[in-house]
Amino acid sequence: MLTRQQKELIVEEMSEIFKKTSLILFADFLGFTVADLTELRSKLREKYGDGARFRVVKNTLLNLALKNAEYEGYEEFLKGPTAVLYVTEGDPVEAVKIVYNFYKDKKADLSRLKGGFLEGKKFTAEEVENIAKLPSKEELYAMLVGRVKAPITGLVFVLSGILRNLVYVLNAIKEKKSE
């Protein structure tokens, strides 16, 4: 059992984390073994290092920490056993994908992913799947570069064609004058 002082430290720590995090995802973890949760944590650690954590915290402590971090509308997420995923560094969408796919692979009820906050905006359990299907930031950057690059490549091709035609015309004029 935690002492009051330990609980206050947890609330203070979680409040500071929630103030700077880009993602908070609440999940029901019942039915998973310790080995399962260790596997999930190692997948997150592999991708994010210390930038993401999946942590089991008492609802009363989460409630106080979220209140201190000035979040609103989180009460519905704090029913039943709750684990919290938070991301402080890296792409938050990728973390949602990791957890979503983990629950899917373990054949867990996906509605147990309760919802949370992405970049400060609240999302529900129904929206977790949509977020998991979004492209990552890296994929979005690649798509953007491809879209920007395509017209430039086309322009270069057109301009080189015009220059090539100009060279052909000049060669034809030169040959005609030399006759």
From Swiss-Prot:
Disulfide bond sites: none
Keywords: Ribonucleoprotein, Ribosomal protein, RNA-binding, rRNA-binding
InterPro entries: Ribosomal_uL10, Ribosomal_uL10-like_sf, Ribosomal_uL10_bac, Ribosomal_uL10_bac_type, Ribosomal_uL10_CS_bac
GO BP terms in the entry: translation
Single annotated GO MF: large ribosomal subunit rRNA binding
Alphabetical list of SUPFAM superfamilies matching this protein: Ribosomal protein L10-like
Pfam families, per the entry: Ribosomal_L10
A GO term from the CC aspect: large ribosomal subunit
Function as written in the Swiss-Prot or TrEMBL entry: Forms part of the ribosomal stalk, playing a central role in the interaction of the ribosome with GTP-bound translation factors.
Family membership noted in the UniProt record: Belongs to the universal ribosomal protein uL10 family.
Subunit structure comment from the entry: Part of the ribosomal stalk of the 50S ribosomal subunit. The N-terminus interacts with L11 and the large rRNA to form the base of the stalk. The C-terminus forms an elongated spine to which L12 dimers bind in a sequential fashion forming a multimeric L10(L12)X complex.
NCBIfam families: PRK00099.1-1
Name of the molecule in the record: Large ribosomal subunit protein uL10
Organism: Thermotoga petrophila (strain ATCC BAA-488 / DSM 13995 / JCM 10881 / RKU-1)
Lineage: Bacteria, Thermotogati, Thermotogota, Thermotogae, Thermotogales
Name of the gene encoding the protein in the UniProt record: rplJ
